[in-house]
Amino acid sequence: MLTEYGDFKRTKYCGEVSEEDIGKEVKLAGWVHRKRHHGGVIFIDLRDREGIVQVVVEEKTNPEAYEVADKLKSEYVIGVVGKVRKRPEGTENPKLKTGYVEVVADRILVFNTSEALPFPVEEETHVSEETKLKYRYIDLRRESMKNNLIFRHRVYQITRNFFTKEGFIEIETPFLTKSTPEGARDFLVPSRLHPGKFYALPQSPQLFKQILMIAGFDRYFQIVKCFRDEDLRADRQPEFTQIDYEMSFVSEEEVMDVAERLIATLFKELLGVELKTPFERISYREAMEKYGTDKPDRRFGLELIELTDIFKNTAFKVFKSVVEAGGIIKAINFKGSNLSRKEIDELTKFVQSLGAKGLAWIKVEKDKLTSPIVKFFTEEETQKLLERTKAEPGDVILFSADKKEMVYKILGNLRLHLGKKYKLIDESKWDVFWIVDFPLMEWDEEEERFVSLHHPFTMPREENIPKLKEALEEEDLEKKKEIVHSVRARAYDMVLNGEEIGGGSIRIHRRDIQEVVFKLLGIGEVEAQEKFGFLLEALKYGAPPHGGLAFGLDRVVALMLGLDSIRDTIAFPKTQRGICPLTGAPDYVDPKQLKELHIKVLE
């Protein structure tokens, strides 16, 4: 029954057969999507990359082809030679782009058979994610998955064309490089030729693209794989793709302008959506104070309301102790929600899972306020609270009182949870904007040191540079924190519908400033030389002012397609545990290989 492909030459994709082909012979190849018997006639839905076309096999006119068709099963790989005709009236299928024509088979060739599939090639498949990834080659046969990857390919095409027209040069940077972990862990690759030494897979091409600027390639771009060995949160991958670019002799505005025009081009060409440029800019401080996060979803309300000043002298001990300890009090007014006690209890459990001690609340009713805490407030405090929150009957006010960082974490997450749970988000909207005016560093209580908000190569604002040296000389830790926290970075993040899709900065191009920043971050001279000596050396030889940005391509594609997970934009992704069910990676290796690498696995 099986035929070698031999001289068979496909003339058209199944999904491209049209009314223009009526009366013509076509040669098609693909998979049997579906087969139906209808009294001496067999109908085959033949599927390939471009779509499905109906093939008709008539026993009366072509018994040989009919005999072959009769033995076909789902997902057999076949070739069809036949003539295109118009479908009989009343049998058209407007859901298919080929739905007004069909191919009458003269000959059917079977190139390969298929066993019964672990799950059908249908859009609605009730199988686990693990099973889909194990049989990814079957999952990718589904229309939606195929379209996702074709869409991603178009993003690549448009991006490359855009940067080429803008005068950028595409340059590849190494995958085997030096370990310079900042934040996430590096994936390490042992060197056989240099026992005990390791390469690292890059978390980003950051240092190489800066060195390319020093080399004089003033406009570089790359679509590049990056790697992070981190605990995978909800929607992360250990290997991911960035659209990366860097420019010399530019300000923030010029780098941001390129980013805006790229995103606007992608939206216009792929979705037919006109994004208004320049995008709005909001400060880091405003984002945190209003939304509790530096990547807010602004497609719904529920902004955070500042209440610390109202309760600074309150008799309510919980609030009073927070204010005395330098904390803050904020609230969300969930307008018209009329939350039940059960719903409030569920929200309390949610915030407790984030580290909150509990959830204070007030239910505003027509003639009274229902709450376990309102009895502790003075009449003046209650009145000011109702005015500040613009409270009306039916509203429920939800409070958080703690250290500033914890309040932002609790209410920022609670706001998003309410938005999703109660369907407050306008899904038809595209809200894209910049977050700017980031602090350069913040104090990490656990590590007891300053950490970069972006990375250690971000340039501070020019007027803030003297403060870095001042902070370095300051011995009092609290004063040092105050000085450092007042330093603003020349950094910018692009946010789309509550997701950070890109981030960048103007970089440090002066060795003296870079050394001061390293010292403030607790990276001493010896460590700086060990990790970043090649960069410090390069900065001595005429480094131009430069800056750039990187977009998370997987995330951009997922958001544009309205997908819940970036996994659906990647051909062969890993699970949340960093496993590839298709290949079984990561896996044990032959002891001989380990011996060659001078590695011993300890139990």
UniProtKB/Swiss-Prot annotation:
InterPro entries: Aa-tRNA-synt_II, aa-tRNA-synth_II, aa-tRNA-synth_II/BPL/LPL, Asp-tRNA-ligase_1, Asp-tRNA-ligase_1_N, Asp/Asn-tRNA-synth_IIb, AspRS_core, GAD-like_sf. The keyword Cell membrane does not apply. Residues 206-209 are annotated as: Aspartate. It is an enzyme of class 6 (ligase). Its EC number is 6.1.1.23. It catalyses: tRNA(Asx) + L-aspartate + ATP = L-aspartyl-tRNA(Asx) + AMP + diphosphate. ATP binds at R228, D229, E230, Q237, E500, G552, L553, D554, R555. Keywords: Aminoacyl-tRNA synthetase, ATP-binding, Cytoplasm, Ligase, Nucleotide-binding, Protein biosynthesis. Its main location: cytoplasm. GO terms for biological process: aspartyl-tRNA aminoacylation. The keyword ATP-binding applies. Coiled coil: none annotated. NCBIfam families: aspS_bact, PRK00476.1. Belongs to the class-II aminoacyl-tRNA synthetase family. Type 1 subfamily. Homodimer. This is Aspartate--tRNA(Asp/Asn) ligase. It comes from Aquifex aeolicus (strain VF5). The lineage of its organism: Bacteria, Pseudomonadati, Aquificota, Aquificia, Aquificales.
